Design a protein with these regions (language model features):
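AAA+ P-loop NTPase catalytic core
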Residues: 1-3, 81, 95-283
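Intrinsically disordered, low-complexity regions enriched in proline, serine, glycine
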Residues: 12-13, 28-29, 53-56, 72-75, ...
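Core residues of folded domains in eukaryotic genome-function proteins
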Residues: 22-24, 30-32, 38-42, 48, ...
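E2/UBC-UEV (E2-variant) core
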Residues: 38, 67-111
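The conserved Walker
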Residues: 8, 60, 270-271
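A short helix-turn-beta junction within AAA+ P-loop NTPase domains corresponding to the substrate/partner-engaging
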Residues: 21-25, 52-81, 86, 283
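Conserved catalytic/switch belt of AAA+ P-loop NTPases
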Residues: 1-45, 67
Length: 283
């Protein structure tokens, strides 16, 4: 199989028309002819056929998959196939329990920082579940040995707490501060005993899952004490970095994402320390 998963280019696709014929001969621009074997097949995975000519379309069978039909479940199923069966069974039930109800709650009551047209929620849901998988991989990585096997067995309760922690920042990471309590309330209703015990004014965003105790802990416990730099006579105010709850949890999330070789995007207005947080993490 030759799989071409890029866009259909109007010029490049014309050279492949002869390959799609019964004779399967590729004619290059310099006049060379390459004969394809009878067992070779070509498959195209473009986003659309805007630049495809009728000659190309008539030579290929077309399978159209709507984004509204695909959803996030095939993505999750593909990832769970790479996990141990016992773990995959637990995670499958957690995806079924939380993802769709939380998406529904967010669509009804919340507004993300990066909004879009009403139909764009499909792609956004897909991206948020991708982020959820990335954070789960980052959290599970600390419980795996060098060969990817489990160092120790994890309880279903711990899996659920870990899932709630990852859901907080994957599905709720782009919410306005005023909308976070709405998502947190719905997560508490679904999580039950697996949710942290918190004050009425607090949300899931103030808590993380401690890997040693396997219990919820407040992010304030991770904020180091800041000491004034007495070794400098006149410290430069613009260069002083004082650890806060926000900076500590952003650094922890960056660590989880980069540990599985993924990228992160910080969203926020000017002057919210996005660049400073990344530079501090890279230092």
């Amino acid at each position: 199989w030759i799989t071409l998963d890029g866009p259909v280019d109007a010029i490049g696709i014309e050279t492949l028309n002869t390959v799609l014929d019964d004779n399967k001969v590729l004619t290059l621009a310099n006049g060379d002819r390459v004969q394809m074997s009878g067992t070779m097949k070509a498959m195209f995975e473009p986003e659309n056929l805007n630049n495809a000519s009728p000659a190309t379309v008539s030579r290929a069978g077309i399978i159209y998959v709507s984004e509204t039909e695909l959803g996030w479940r095939p993505l999750v199923a593909s990832w769970l196939d790479t996990r141990p069966k016992a773990e995959a069974a637990v995670l499958t039930s957690l995806f079924d329990k939380y993802v769709d109800p939380l998406f529904h709650a967010m669509k009804m009551t919340c507004k993300p920082v990066m909004g879009g047209a009403p139909w764009e929620h499909v792609s956004r849901d897909f991206c948020q579940v991708t982020t959820l998988i990335t954070l789960l991989r980052g959290c599970l990585r600390s419980h795996e040995d060098e060969k990817g096997g489990k160092k120790e067995s994890l309880s279903e309760t711990y899996y659920e707490k870990m899932f709630l922690y990852c859901v907080t920042w994957s599905l709720g990471g782009m919410l306005q501060a005023s909308d976070r309590p709405k998502l947190s309330k719905r997560m508490q209703e679904l999580g039950g005993a697996s949710a942290p015990t918190m004050a009425a004014s607090e949300t899931f965003f103030e808590y993380f899952l401690d890997e040693d105790s396997r219990e919820w802990a407040h992010w304030e416990s991770r904020v180091p004490e800041w000491l004034y730099p007495h070794d400098e006579e006149t410290p430069k105010f613009a260069q002083l970095i004082i650890p806060t709850l926000d900076s500590v949890r952003l650094e922890a999330l960056l660590g989880a994402v980069t540990s599985v070789d993924k990228q992160a995007l910080f969203v926020g207005g000017p002057g919210t320390a996005k660049t400073t947080a990344i530079k501090q993490f890279m230092a």
